[in-house]
Amino acid sequence: MSSARSPYLRFGLIFAAVAFLLDQVTKWIVTVPLSLEPKGQIELTSFFNLTWAENCGISLSMFASCTDTTRWTLVAVTGIVAAAVAFWMTREQAKGDVIALALILGGALGNIVDRVRFGYVVDFADLHIGDFRPFMIFNVADACITIGVLLLVARALLLGEKAGQADAKPSVD
């Protein structure tokens, strides 16, 4: 990460906004027009259902108690993480890393909005093979965060120091 302003910052912020909006719009579609109710389910295919889940905690049901203390602690912690990711994005010179950070930022903000509005995060995407469910029920924000983290890890492992050099904007002297 450089101390110079990222040449991809505007792009990253737009990308984060799109991720955030996709998350919020899909949650609205599932809860309002489709009228999916808490603990309700709509079977779309043999491997994908829309299943309403109210997630008071974080992944794998950690911190799942639905208390005000848990709610506001998770809002604060997620807000701090989102601020750190946004700051990192302002300095990141590699376009691929900015995309990954934007996904994480947009997803984090989407889940923060849910937690502030409802006290829980609305999850609805239920991928399964018969009765086998390899994933927890999730939402677009969760998918964005996961994909963003995996992109950062993959780029760090596969490209290493070359990541910033490979897709950074060339400087004009």
From Swiss-Prot:
UniProt main location, coarse: membrane
Transmembrane segments: 11-31, 69-89, 93-113, 134-154
Catalytic activity: Release of signal peptides from bacterial membrane prolipoproteins. Hydrolyzes -Xaa-Yaa-Zaa-|-(S,diacylglyceryl)Cys-, in which Xaa is hydrophobic (preferably Leu), and Yaa (Ala or Ser) and Zaa (Gly or Ala) have small, neutral side chains
The EC number(s) this enzyme carries: 3.4.23.36
GO molecular function, one term: aspartic-type endopeptidase activity
Enzyme class per UniProt: hydrolase
Positions of the catalytic residues: D123, D142
Keyword match Cell inner membrane: yes
Record-level GO BP terms: proteolysis
Compartment(s) of residence: Cell inner membrane
Cellular component annotations (GO), alphabetically ordered: plasma membrane
Membrane topology (UniProt): Multi-pass membrane protein
Keyword annotations from UniProtKB, A to Z: Aspartyl protease, Cell inner membrane, Cell membrane, Hydrolase, Membrane, Protease, Transmembrane, Transmembrane helix
Pathway per the UniProt entry: Protein modification; lipoprotein biosynthesis (signal peptide cleavage)
Pfam family membership, one: Peptidase_A8
Function of the molecule: This protein specifically catalyzes the removal of signal peptides from prolipoproteins.
Family membership noted in the UniProt record: Belongs to the peptidase A8 family.
The name this protein goes by in its record: Lipoprotein signal peptidase
